A protein has these predicted regions:
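Conserved structural scaffold segments of CAZyme catalytic domains across common CAZy folds
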Residues: 1-105, 383
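Acidic/polar loop patches that form or flank catalytic/metal-binding clefts of enzymes
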Residues: 167-172, 263-272, 291-293, 329
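Solvent-exposed beta-strand/loop surfaces of large extracellular or lumenal domains
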Residues: 141, 345-371
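C-terminal beta-strand-rich structural cap/linker in extracellular carbohydrate-active enzymes
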Residues: 365-402
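Aromatic- and carboxylate-enriched substrate-binding clefts and catalytic-loop regions
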Residues: 77-247
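Carbohydrate-binding surface patches
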Residues: 299-342, 384-387
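Glycan-recognition and catalytic regions of carbohydrate-active enzymes
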Residues: 270-316, 351-357
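Conserved, mostly hydrophobic/aromatic
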Residues: 66, 141, 168, 257, ...
């Protein structure tokens, strides 16, 4: 059928519906979550009393950061093992057993980056080792193919990991085709020209962020690595003059507009703590959704999405725009009638701009109802995010959100 409303494409889940039914077995252990990621800033943390780098002290720092702010996992990306081909032996600078023990004590799981080729040669042996170590999952990388042999190998990886209680993030992958339905431990796929490329280029435009939900994301979850708060890469990698073409509020919105049950918190922990009031949204936002509503959308121009958290019933809204400043009028008709809600809005400041003033944002909290309509202005390359919960007696003095 042909639908005149572009939002209908966003609601399409045909790839998932046509996929194989879930395999038998207990999947209650599978936990979507946020993951602290060190690759973006190359482990260049500062203000600490140890030498940062690929070592035990640095990764303990990430575990402590994750535990403090409710982040579920940390990722040890490429470089943790003695080589990319020997992924059963950590570098001598890393006491992986101690990291896993420390993470378990703090409630933070450890996920390991792996190259696909050694997995192909010794899949069960490597995954047995990871299970015995206490690793929670793998990010497998550089497959870069979609021939029949590789497609079968994806299935083998997912099955072997499921049997051992490991989550999977397919990086360097082709777009998903429903494998996450068959194996619920498969949480995400790259299969996209994602934000990590901003580390070494400025190719990703605001238009890109407004186009992907209508193209790549229709196929399934997408590991886009959002959450950058400091847009000039030279801040963490001196001499690198790349720039993220987004405002800080836009980066918050991507946690809602870009669907993935596994979402990176990609920036430096110090950057998050510098903008702690904005980071609160990343702390709060859910990743496991009961319902999604596509409120406003025009391919390549803008998109506004509202999603309802599965466990809490709270709503989260995200909106992004292209290189044009625009104002959108938000409906709240998805909320229950007769109830009051408290909404916290994270929006671009009046002088925000993705090129000249990306860190300018405002935060406002107030009451909303099902019949509320709210005008929100987005800067060039900007956006907004909203968290919504039911009001309590303690909120009775709050004014209407404006």
């Amino acid at each position: 059928t042909i639908d005149p409303d572009d939002r209908a494409l966003l609601e399409n889940n045909l790839a998932y519906q046509l996929a194989s039914k879930p395999v038998e077995g207990d999947a209650s252990w599978v936990r979507p979550g946020k993951i602290s990621w060190e690759w973006w800033h190359s482990l260049n943390i500062y203000g600490v009393d140890f030498r940062s780098g690929v070592n035990t002290a640095t990764y303990k720092y990430y575990i402590d950061f994750a535990a403090k702010y409710g982040i579920d996992y940390i990722l040890l990306d490429e470089g943790w093992s003695v080589s990319t081909l020997n992924i059963k032996e950590p570098r001598r600078e890393i006491d992986l057993g101690e990291l896993i023990r420390h993470g378990r004590e703090k409630g933070v799981g450890v996920v390991l980056w792996t190259l696909w080729n050694p997995m192909k040669k010794d899949l069960e042996g490597i995954l047995d080792t990871y299970r015995d170590w206490g690793v929670k999952g793998i990010k497998i990388d550089f497959m870069q193919r979609s021939d029949q042999e590789m497609v079968r190998f994806y299935d083998e990886i997912a099955r072997a990991a499921f049997d051992r209680g490991l989550i999977v993030d397919f990086h360097g992958s082709f777009k998903p085709a429903g494998l996450q339905r068959k194996y619920p431990n498969v949480l995400s796929f790259e299969g996209v020209y994602g934000m990590e490329h901003d580390k070494c280029s400025t190719d990703i435009s605001p238009v890109h962020d407004c186009t992907l939900p209508f193209t790549r994301m229709v196929a399934g979850p997408m590991d886009y690595t959002p959450g950058i708060f400091v847009m000039d890469v030279a801040e963490v990698n001196p001499g690198n003059h790349s720039h993220v073409n987004a405002t800080l509020a836009n980066q918050l919105a991507l946690y809602v507009t870009m669907y993935s049950p596994l979402q990176m918190a990609a920036d430096l922990p110090e950057h998050y703590e510098k903008y702690m009031d904005a980071f609160r949204f990343i702390e709060d936002v859910a990743l496991d959704w009961e319902e999604s509503r596509y409120l406003l959308a025009e391919p390549g121009d803008y998109i506004v999405v509202a999603r309802k958290a599965k466990d809490t019933g709270e709503w989260f809204v995200g909106g992004v725009t292209d290189e044009n400043r625009r104002t959108v009028t938000l409906p709240f008709d998805y909320l229950d009638p007769g109830k009051e809600y408290v909404a916290t809005l994270y929006a671009d400041a009046p002088d925000a701009d993705y090129q000249t003033n990306p860190q300018a944002y405002v935060i406002r909290t107030g009451k909303v109802r099902q019949r509320t309509e709210l005008d929100v202005e987005m800067a060039r390359g900007g956006g907004f995010a909203i968290s919504i919960r039911e009001a309590t007696d303690a909120d009775r003095k709050l004014c209407k959100l404006k």
